[in-house]
Amino acid sequence: MNGLITDLYQLTMANALFNKGRHERKVVFDRFYRKNPFNGGYTIVAGLEHLQQFVENFRFDEEDINYLESLQIFYPAFLDYLKDFRFKGDIYAVPEGTVVFPGEPLLRFHGTTTEAMLLETGLSMIMNHESLIATKARRVRTVAPRDALMEFGLRRAQGHSAGLWGARAAMIGGFNGTSNVEAGKRFGIPVLGTMAHSWVMSFDEEIDAFREYVRQYHCLLYT
């Protein structure tokens, strides 16, 4: 995982603390939020699997170090320190799918000052995005408790990763399946789908498009 997935000020603060000899101080960070999304009354926690992968693989490779060196704002000794950076602390979190409220700690981070600073941006990115999707999914499930709900967010996601992990978050929120084939394979999510307008446009008559689809996929109800 690219160690540059962070904000510049996290690195400059860590650089300055390193120069002062304060970079290995033990700290505890609590992560919480101030306002529920969608003007709602709760939030659904999601993102912990993604977060775990992010933390376990967060490191700086040679290209990362060379880029940071080119910025000419970091001490050489700090860049040497980053070459071997690995998270060695502990993270405690509320289970995924839990209903939480503003001001409650969702995650508690035990580590060094440097670890907390370098990882904070990525942790926030992951939990903010996936908890948002899970919360929306739960709100939809609440008003449609007996309906089959399918997640089709890939084509409007803000990038590949958002589409992949967003599909998983929707399942945490209560959806039944996803159109995202990669998410189905990776996370064991049921893959679902209908058909696109391009299929209908491939036929002279609309009814023929529907009949042919039913003929080829016998699990569909033919009427």
Regions found by a protein language model. Give the residues of each.
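Ordered alpha/beta subdomains of enzyme catalytic regions
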Residues: 1-217
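Conserved small/polar residues in nucleotide/adenosyl-binding loops
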Residues: 222-223
